[in-house]
Amino acid sequence: AASSATVTVKSHGDLLGQVNWGELEQKGQVANDRVKAEIIDSGRNWVHTTVIDEDTGMPIPCRIHFRSVKGVPYAPHGYHSHVNSDMGTWHIDNGGDVRLGQSSYAYIDGTCQGWLPRGEVIVDVARGFEYEPLRVKMRVEPGQRNLELRIKRWCDMKADRYFSGDTHVHFLSTQGAHTEAQGEDLDVVNLLLSQWGHLFSNTEEFIGHPSVAHNGKSIVYATQENRQHVLGHLTLLGLKYPVDPWCSGGSNEAEHGGNLETTLSHWADACRDQGGTVILPHIPNPNCEPATLIATGRVDAVEYLTHAIYGHNEYYRYLNCGYKLPLVGGTDKMTSDVPVGLYRTYVYIPDNEEFNYDNWCKYLRAGNTFLSGGPIIRLTADGQPIGST
């Protein structure tokens, strides 16, 4: 607008005030006793952002969120400013970004670019549990084209031979799982095929062996969660060929009106026959066949999603009956409001053995694990490490 222009503000035909545009541009805001006019967009710059690991001096994968001081989000180009969620992204719009509360984050390889407003900008950067989260208020100056941020690792579990993984992830692509895993400093993702009525998910991802990122920083294994809505669910890790049918017994987990064609015990045996690992997910629900599976030695570990007292009590019932069951952490991620590895399993692999998927599962079965939703645990009992029996 020309500097001589007049901005008129009305409410239901009632004149609240008039402001000269030139004065508003000069002062930023003009007010009277009835209305205040303020310029909230002072212009914008296309900014190239790099996030640096403080220890290595190199760009580091992470998740990042930009917003103005008034709360307006500015996503890096190619990402969503606001990710629809609250189960609105079940099975769709999954991968590349994540929403936590009201903030949508972009997963980046350490670099990104896009429009940022001139003036004060708030930036949030995070990377899993082992890096200090960063929140900074900074200024984007006219003409600025570059921004460098630094994050610092506060502990290094891999240096102590603990490797993290999520046992329970749905709907991501294999490459999307690598991207999100590295952004969350997660070493292993178990990407689970399954069935939801007439919908089959991730069929095309199954290859029967692990996918290792080109930089060796993450492993994704597309495997299965087999489900029956009353008998229970099973996570079958490390499958070399499918265990069919994936789901059985109708409802919304198999074909509508379908019959019960198999049991969890059969699925567990078929997994074990090919060297796989059997996890009882989100203990204790559904809860008809798990007791049989545990009593007959068909379960290698049980998975926590939360620390709800119901699951806690159920787990201790089995311990008190003499069944030694390793605990693992998995998210059951199905939407864009759950970051991969929000609940994760740390598995100890000895110095003389390579970190790979087979060894990760081997030592998971052995119980050399702890699970976490954020805290990092270091303890011994009579000199024995976590997982000793």
What are these regions (language model features)?
Residues 159-327, 331-337:
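Catalytic cores of extracellular degradative/oxidative enzymes
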Residues 1-38, 46, 52-114, 120-156, ...:
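C-terminal functional module detector
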Residues 38-41, 224-225:
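Short linear motifs in intrinsically disordered
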Residues 48, 63-64, 168, 233:
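Conserved beta-strand and immediately adjacent loop positions that scaffold enzyme active sites
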Residues 84-86, 94, 106-115, 194, ...:
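Glycine- and small hydrophobic-enriched segments that form the cores of compact globular domains
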